[in-house]
Amino acid sequence: MTLPRTPSQTVGPYYAIGLSRDPQNELAKRNDPGALRLIGQLIDGEGSPIGDGMIEIWDAAGHRWGRSGTDADGRFSFVVTKPDALPGEAPRFDVFVFARGLLRHELTRIYFPDETAANAADPVLSALDGAGAATLVAEEEDGALRWDVRMQGDRATVFFTH
């Protein structure tokens, strides 16, 4: 027998009603100089993919944003160029994570692996312990940047109060 999801197991009715799951995931054209594929997977506390989530990324300087629903395997993708850094900070994207069971979206960040000096000087990233900071830095993988979101458990992504 299959039971319907309870309200606490969903993002709520407005997720389906008010938001389109149509991808708005190209913040840059694929042939733009410096264009990168940003890929990842949304994973729950048991290590299973979250196939009905949504990831929104915002250029920290506020110039661009994009949205990608997750597929059945929890995968999402974007086409981006590296955003400008704010003064005294490393280049990054701010990220909102929407997933079942959350009454409010979670906030986190994506930093770039080739910005070692800027990442070390970033006031937020440098305040985290090594394991926590590592959850916010994308990794290079087959010509793309990979950044997974782990909601709980081992290597859980760091989330911020907002």
Roles of regions detected by a PLM:
Residues M1-A134, E139-H162:
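Beta-strand-dominated extracellular/periplasmic modules and repeats
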